[in-house]
Swiss-Prot record:
It holds the Pfam family Squash. This is Trypsin inhibitor 2. It comes from Momordica charantia. Inhibits trypsin. It comes from the Eukaryota. Keywords: Disulfide bond, Knottin, Protease inhibitor, Secreted, Serine protease inhibitor. It is found in: Secreted. The presence of a 'disulfide through disulfide knot' structurally defines this protein as a knottin. SUPFAM superfamilies: Plant inhibitors of proteinases and amylases. One of its GO terms (molecular function) is serine-type endopeptidase inhibitor activity.
Length: 28
């Protein structure tokens, strides 16, 4: 699944946080 590219959006999404590395304001 594609996670939000904006870090704050990723941080609000626990599923995304479990799957993504969020750095420098972006999710990758």
């Amino acid at each position: 699944r594609i996670c939000p590219r904006i870090w704050m959006e990723c941080k609000r999404d626990s599923d995304c946080m479990a799957q993504c590395i969020c750095v420098d304001g972006h999710c990758g």
